[in-house]
Design a protein with these regions (language model features):
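Sec-dependent N-terminal signal peptides
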Residues: 4-13
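Cytochrome P450 heme-binding "Cys pocket" and the immediately downstream C-terminal segment
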Residues: 16
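Beta-strand-enriched cores of mature, soluble protein domains
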Residues: 19-142
Length: 142
């Protein structure tokens, strides 16, 4: 009986403290980029620059620094910067997240802080270094 009560309490508290991140279908958009350049200065960390279409933000330019602080062979972390201009308005964003190698592509997951009404964007995507493409799903965090 004690075990049953323990498991019920454990399950209830797990659900009570769970976080739910939702993609809002009305504000979600696709962003596609062509990788312009990739280089390394030390054989450990890599820098990438890309340009492409960021949905409602139009033409965008992004840069990343990929690091691997835990010396993993299949995942790591990144920081970056994005910039776009829509007419007279300039929108900038700082990018930070994690990546994981899955087969021939890398999956990226990111939380991005923007200057567009201080929106925080949640981003997931696939990077294909062979095809030199980056494809993301982007949505403001609710």
């Amino acid at each position: 009986m004690k075990k049953l009560i323990f498991y019920l309490l454990f399950f209830a508290t797990t659900l009570g403290f769970a976080q739910d991140i939702e993609w809002d279908p009305k504000t979600t958009f696709e962003a596609t980029f062509d990788i312009d350049a990739v280089h390394t200065r030390d054989g450990i960390n890599y820098e990438l620059s890309a340009s492409g279409d960021a949905g409602p933000y139009g033409k965008a330019y992004i840069s990343y620094v990929f690091t691997n602080y835990n010396n993993s062979t299949s995942n790591g972390e990144f920081t970056g910067f994005a910039w776009t201009q829509m007419g007279e308005d300039i929108v900038k964003a700082t990018l930070q997240g994690v990546f994981r190698k899955e087969g021939k592509v890398f999956k990226m997951y990111s939380y991005d802080n923007t200057t567009d009404d201080d929106k925080i964007m949640i981003v997931s995507g696939i990077v294909d270094f062979v095809e030199q493409t980056m494809k993301f799903k982007v949505s403001p965090l609710k």
